[in-house]
Curated annotation (Swiss-Prot):
Belongs to the class-I aminoacyl-tRNA synthetase family. ValS type 2 subfamily. This is Valine--tRNA ligase. It is an enzyme of class 6 (ligase). The keyword Acetylation does not apply. It catalyses: tRNA(Val) + L-valine + ATP = L-valyl-tRNA(Val) + AMP + diphosphate. It comes from Rickettsia felis (strain ATCC VR-1525 / URRWXCal2).
């Protein structure tokens, strides 16, 4: 045993151990060990899009609890760290940090700046991850923009092309006008926004018959009647059956209808007006045409069951495109395409109504003003409705028709639901989120982005005569390729047009397992032996808000590539909230910076706070929990320091032996009860960790440490451990062995959660080897002392009564007692002696009265 330092300095010790762990490669993966001994983790590659916050620490440390446990259980851990350092999130960081815009410079110049920024940011990430003691093997690090990752990502694309699961199409897609790129369904947020429902008058194509422009469903019975003064609408009284004729003010020779819309700026793109086929108000419109106000476009009046009869007037204009229903109608009814919105979110429609070049909101305001001037806007209603916005920029999305690459998704929904059920979910209720997302999918996955810093498509388009537009794919031997610099085999630069788009960043991070295993499928692999050994993986840890993206896309890719799941287990963490349980945000000023907390409390305390939250639960940051963690670190130090003074009395061979091998030397009844409780704790904590319930394991261990070990066992066994008069040598040795092995086992149980303090104490007290080494979990065999636990538990109950008595009398805990009269139980001689010592009682008398323990204290 080493000399015990006077105090524990967490700042110095945490830095010391972090450096030693790296130097000694404590966390290194061994590629030579068999597959069945490997535990492979698909670590979340943090997006290089800004500063890491306490929420990252919260989720990453929870993964590390499980990884450290599995390593100590004897698993060969494959625990990489990646960086998702390409795509729109990274571009936005670079533009903000450098105060530049990608479209104002050359592509190559912008990419170079991106590479410089991500290199700097990733170094900050590494530093923080080391400070919070993530036990990753840094030799397995990857970047999603590296040449190898680009190669594997392009392999994924080509494999899906070969399998017929990828296609290119000129079809309506979601478009972010701020970032100037197509987006996938998973990249959007539904936001509640205030707007106006505008009731606009459309004319019906002129003819001879008059028509009531006001007809409501509850009032309409049949055709309206002629009148030289006014039109008549007919209403039937349901209670009497009588028909009432009501005069209306109308214009002769013209018929009109009213539609309600939130997007009047799309009037030039109107291609039809729809009503529900069961709506009696509008059945007479079948086969007719309407004239769009201001722009005089003739559009058909059509029936479709998707119309909501009770929304607005029950008449809906179909524009190309305002929403997904417009797309459905456009396809179903073979309607023409009128595109008036540009990629920059402006109107492209030269007309007497001067809206050309205006932004969407500006055009909307101008159209409404003109409609009012011409009495074509009958009313406006303020409403709150859901608007689809870009997750990153926050901009309301447009729907444009731009050629894009898609992965077939809708056709696989049933198979993906089955995959979700095959996966082991921790916690189980998170599966519902994936199932709900899969059921809601209505678009194939658009994987192309009109950006710059990303993985390029290995694609060119032929300009050769006779095959113009033919898609040319790179050969696997060419990967990774940049179509702007490289050429397809057999073609010259003049004969091809490169694909300028880059892949959705999720298209690369969705193969994060394969970025580590170095393979995609049997046909596309960099290292087949490595891939087959590591894939499918054991664990995917991630946060719940990216179930619809990262989890879903990774499952989809593995299903399409190899007809399998990418991992066996998924553990889903919750959010870290502010102390008032509100969401952390920069605008609120309540974002916690990990570096400041590390300086104040140290890594072990922060990890303790993280371990106090159940998996999947959203948890508020708590200063009280942090203080409890600091108190626990100090108590571990002091308890270890206290018990260490006795260890020199043990024989060296007994120090080196396993607990099972010295069980015969633990002879005292209370010591044996203590070891039995310890073995029970190990079984429970091990089971909880095997089921990813780290919080339960931490709670059980902490409760045992405070309540059983510190508050009771240390006090009860203290006299025997000292035994200054050498009255009970076997009892003394028994207690010291119990202290020795209990402290050692507790350090191992705490090690996954608080790695620094446990390493420091373990190496002072027990070994030069790391407590975190592979296979160093508790091995107790079939250890179990055949004793009646009622005796030791009775001792504790009596002690509790005596402590309360002394507290009520304001007496010192060491205050002497002349006599304890105890009824309801009789203790053995060994337990009686321990009870006398801990209560400072001169004498204890047992009386056989009843089953309930009662104690009479005589001072």
């Amino acid at each position: 045993m080493k000399e015990f330092p006077k105090n524990y300095n967490f700042t110095e010790n945490e830095k010391k151990w972090q450096q030693i762990w790296q130097e000694k490669q404590i966390y290194a993966y061994d590629p030579n060990i068999s597959k069945d001994e490997i535990y492979v983790v698909d670590t979340p590659p943090p997006t290089v899009s800004g500063q890491l916050h306490i929420g990252h620490v919260y989720s990453y440390t929870q993964t590390d609890f499980i990884v450290r446990f599995q390593r100590m259980m004897g698993k060969n851990i494959f625990y990489p760290m990646g960086f998702d350092d390409n795509g729109l999130p990274t571009e936005r960081l670079v533009e903000k940090q450098k105060q530049i815009k990608a479209y104002n410079m050359s592509r190559s110049e912008f990419i170079k700046i991106c590479e410089e920024v991500v290199a700097s940011e990733e170094e900050k990430f590494r530093s923080l991850f080391n400070q919070i003691a993530l036990s990753v093997d840094w030799s397995l690090e990857y970047q999603t923009i590296s040449p190898l990752s680009r190669k594997i990502s392009q392999m994924s694309f080509l494999d899906l092309v070969k399998k017929g699961e990828v296609y290119r199409n000129d079809q309506p897609i979601l478009w972010d006008p701020v970032d100037g790129t197509a987006l996938a369904q998973a990249d959007i947020d539904d936001k509640e926004k205030t707007s106006f429902m505008n009731y606009i008058t459309f004319e019906i194509e002129e003819d001879d018959r008059p028509f009531s422009k006001f007809a409501y469903r509850e009032e309409f019975v049949g055709n309206t009647e002629h009148s030289t003064a006014a039109y008549i609408k007919v209403r039937e009284d349901a209670s009497t059956g009588l028909t009432h004729k009501l005069p209306l003010e109308v214009e002769f020779g013209k018929r009109s209808i009213t539609i309600a819309t939130t997007r009047p700026e799309l009037l030039p793109a109107c291609v039809a007006v729809f009503y529900h086929p069961d709506d009696k108000r509008y059945k007479h419109l079948a086969g007719k045409s309407a004239i769009t106000p201001l722009f005089n476009g003739k559009v058909p009046l059509l029936a479709d069951p998707l119309v909501q009869q009770d929304k607005g007037t029950g008449l809906v204009m179909c524009c190309t495109f305002g929403d997904q229903t417009d797309i459905t109608w456009w396809k179903t009814h073979n309607l023409p395409l009128k595109t008036i919105v540009t990629k920059k979110g402006t109107i492209d429609f030269p007309h007497d109504i001067a809206i050309d070049g205006l932004k969407i909101k500006e055009a909307r305001t101008k159209i409404i003003d003109i409609l009012k001037e011409q009495n074509l806007l009958t009313k406006q209603e303020e409403i709150t409705h859901t608007v689809k916005c870009a997750e990153r920029s926050g901009a309301p999305l447009e729907i444009l028709t731009v050629p894009q690459w898609f992965v077939k998704t809708i056709s696989h929904k049933e198979a993906l639901l089955k995959r979700a059920s095959e996966l082991n979910w921790h916690p189980k209720n998170m599966k519902i989120r994936l199932e709900s997302w899969i059921n809601s999918i209505s678009w194939d996955w658009c994987i192309s982005r009109q950006r710059y810093f990303g993985v390029p498509f290995p694609v060119w388009y032929s300009k050769r005569v006779g095959e113009e537009g033919k898609i040319l794919y790179a050969d696997i031997s060419q990967l990774p390729v940049d179509p702007l610099k490289d050429l397809p085999i057999g073609y010259s630069k003049e004969e091809v047009e490169p694909d300028l788009d880059v892949m959705d960043t999720w298209a690369t991070s969705s193969v994060s397992p394969q970025l580590s295993t170095h393979g995609i499928s049997d046909d596309f692999t960099v290292n087949k032996e490595r891939h087959d050994k590591l894939f499918p993986m054991e664990l995917r840890p991630q946060a719940h808000e990216i179930i619809r993206t990262w989890a879903f896309y990774t499952i989809l890719k593995a299903h399409l590539h190899q007809n399998t799941l990418p991992w066996k287990n998924i553990m889903v963490s919750g959010w870290c909230l502010a102390e008032d349980r509100s969401k952390m945000s920069k605008s609120k000023g309540n974002v916690l910076v990990p570096e400041k907390l590390l300086e104040q409390y140290g890594s072990d305390v922060i990890r303790y706070w993280s371990a106090n939250s159940k998996l999947g639960a959203d948890t508020a940051y708590s200063e009280d929990v942090m203080k409890n963690g600091k108190r626990l670190v100090n108590k571990l130090w002091n308890a270890a320091k206290f018990v260490s003074i006795h260890f020199e009395k043990l024989k060296d061979k007994d120090k080196q032996a396993k607990l099972l091998d010295v069980k015969e030397k633990i002879t005292n009844e209370f010591d044996q009860w203590m070891i039995n409780k310890l073995v029970e704790l190990v079984k429970l904590a091990t089971n909880e960790l095997q089921n990813y319930e780290y919080a339960n394991a931490m709670h059980l261990t902490e409760k045992f440490f405070w309540a059983i070990f510190c508050d009771n066992y240390l006090e009860i066994s203290k006299n025997r451990a000292y035994d200054e008069e050498n009255k009970n040598p076997s009892g003394q040795y028994s207690s010291i062995l119990t202290l020795y092995h209990t402290m050692q086992i507790l350090l191992k149980l705490f090690a996954p959660f608080m790695p620094h303090i446990t390493e420091e104490l373990y190496q002072i007290l027990y070994s030069d080897k790391s407590v975190h080494e592979k296979g160093n979990w508790v091995n107790y065999g079939d250890l179990n002392y055949k004793i009646d636990a009622k005796g030791a538990e009775g001792l504790l109950e009596i002690l509790d009564i005596v402590r309360k008595f002394k507290a009520e009398k304001n007496l010192s805990i060491k205050a002497p007692i002349k006599l304890l009269e105890v009824s309801g139980i009789e203790l053995s001689a060994e337990l009686t002696e321990d009870l006398k010592n801990v209560t400072s009682a001169e004498e204890i008398q047992f009386e056989d009265q009843g089953d309930k323990i009662k104690v009479n204290v005589i001072l």
